[in-house]
Swiss-Prot record:
Keywords: Cell membrane, Lipid biosynthesis, Lipid metabolism, Membrane, Phospholipid biosynthesis, Phospholipid metabolism, Repeat, Transferase, Transmembrane, Transmembrane helix. The lineage of its organism: Bacteria, Bacillati, Bacillota, Bacilli, Bacillales. One of its GO terms (biological process) is cardiolipin biosynthetic process. Its EC number is 2.7.8.-. GO terms for cellular component: plasma membrane. GO terms for molecular function: cardiolipin synthase activity. It comes from Staphylococcus aureus (strain MRSA252). The gene is cls2. Belongs to the phospholipase D family. Cardiolipin synthase subfamily. This is Cardiolipin synthase 2.
Amino acid sequence: MIELLSIALKHSNIILNSIFIGAFILNLLFAFTIIFMERRSANSIWAWLLVLVFLPLFGFILYLLLGRQIQRDQIFKIDKEDKKGLELIVDEQLAALKNENFSNSNYQIVKFKEMIQMLLYNNAAFLTTDNDLKVYTDGQEKFDDLIQDIRNATDYIHFQYYIIQNDELGRTILNELGKKAEQGVEVKILYDDMGSRGLRKKGLHPFRNKGGHAEAFFPSKLPLINLRMNNRNHRKIVVIDGQIGYVGGFNVGDEYLGKSKKFGYWRDTHLRIVGDAVNALQLRFILDWNSQATRDHISYDDRYFPDVNSGGTIGVQIASSGPDEEWEQIKYGYLKMISSAKKSIYIQSPYFIPDQAFLDSIKIAALGGVDVNIMIPNKPDHPFVFWATLKNAASLLDAGVKVFHYDNGFLHSKTLVIDDEIASVGTANMDHRSFTLNFEVNAFIYDQQIAKKLKQAFIDDLAVSSELTKARYAKRSLWIKFKEGISQLLSPIL
């Protein structure tokens, strides 16, 4: 009996050793891939190497799920003719900016032509100058208007969200969309497979039965694992009849109406756009939809790109970023805005984990006399991200940056306002995930009134916020310091 046990133990040791050796070899292969085969920052390389070294059995699994980079040419393919048409618009606008004969005399457009040119050149983010914008900071008002616009649709509704919850608000909106589909309106929903995992097929049955079309972005081909879970479509876009567009931070669900016991009031920022910028949102939706739809592709007919007479005069560029792009366009837009600041910078972001160069640009502005204000949440939805955000924001205090914690629920707003003149609102957080891994979309706005409105929203939020002073930060416990340190170490892969 003892001899049998000895043989069994010997065989089990051989099996365990084989598993460890196999895991070690896999980790080496993945380490080799990270260092030599993929384009990454040095910080990201070191973070993944630490994971692979200290988690030899699970490191390669984490890398498969969260670390793999997708080749750009495997994501989106734009027809040559469509690309040629877009390039023609961009070339015309670049020439106009270079010759200083742009048809619109908007002061902001003339002053910030270098930034406009950068977004044009890197992202084909063509400039539109005839827009009218409405700013939302409250979910109830935003969804009331959205539902009314859905009810008024006559031709088509293109509806894209990262999260669509299968709850009261989610079902209400899906029901309204289904009604329009029954009336003969073309209704297409594009949802992220991970973000909307509570919805997926069952929650969409009534909508589809009424004639609506829905597609998942990067759906999992395996029952429990999504090997593309690290690259999610975080965009929120609605286009109605080519006349009205929505873009911003709100997802669809009761949580975003302030009904979550965990988060309470949900503070976010969203835009309703009427004008030619809607065409840019439409183009982004079509590219995303056609990349995922196996059939039922959307054409580039004039029907989807009508002339819009908004009566507005606001300049807007719609910029996208994601792993399919060569440049980190939204990040570059943020950096260009920050470097142009002369008087003030107002930032709201739930996740503030940029790279050191980004942090240095903010420090340089503050040390140069610019009034820099940053607002972050005071409660975590993702603990590691929360502590890394706190440490990064606090690192700016010595440079004179003022940091505020939003105390009235959860802050999810992604806004940047410079000198009461230009602003950005969209889906991109100020972190590595938004800049590099996820698919994002932002509106860059050249208008004093909108910039002042967004700045005033920040100032109004100060009434329900608390300042993070150096003295207050110095009193944090050793346990918090430890959590900050670990989170900071992992921040390149959060």
